[in-house]
Amino acid sequence: REAGMHGSRLAARYLASCLKEAGIAPLEKDNSYQPFEAYTKERQQRGRWPVQRDSIAILQQGVHRILQMSNVLGTIPGERPDEYVIVGAHFDHLGVDETLANDRIYNGADDNASGVSAVLQIARAFLATGQKPLRTVIFAFWDWEENGFLGSKYFVQSCPFISQVKGYLNFDMIGRNNKPEQPQHVVYFYTAAHPVFGDWLKQDIARYSLRLQPDYRAWARPTGGRYNAASALCHLPIT
């Protein structure tokens, strides 16, 4: 699912079909896609290269191409339709590396099909309640996050209502446990300036008897982690 490649386009198409099948409206009127483009350097293959007079200049100059990409965005309108909460995960990964000797495919089951499946399940759960959320919920699947989180950056920079977004919940690599001896262990990041995010999880664990042992990690800086960076540019509370 390398960004801009065939696998990534198929993944975007699949996610859009999942939203449609679940009955989740697209954020835009026409469809769930938010297309954008970016430049990237051509990947060079390993091997022997003939040395020409201008070889150094050519190598320094590099070869670029334009890639077409797309975020996938769905929404459930809330009782306060002009206030928003975003639930997101990136769906791209590293694709295929032909220079590798054995398995050349980066499958990306944990990074980040696990987060994508969580966002889809949350969207379905919202619909299953039959109730309107308090705020409008946007379900966002970001393209090209692995190399500069361009998908979420593009959304933030082009969103006309970004000042009305009240928070962002990010799901990334939730399919594995860094402490095998503690199967209920989970890492939970949140913005330090908004400790209520930590309090809410503690309350839910007690209320619903969730089998989780969170490792609470408060971020002192609003820029936070890799995939929350674009949202943090607008100083959104994040978890």
Task: State each model region's role.
Residues 19, 25-26, 42-43, 65, ...:
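Solvent-exposed loop/turn segments at secondary-structure junctions
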Residues 4-12, 29, 65-67, 84, ...:
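Solvent-exposed, acidic/flexible segments
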Residues 1-6, 21, 58-63, 100-112, ...:
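Second-shell loop/turn segments in exported
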Residues 72-74, 87-148:
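Alpha-helical metal-binding/catalytic segments enriched in His/Glu/Asp
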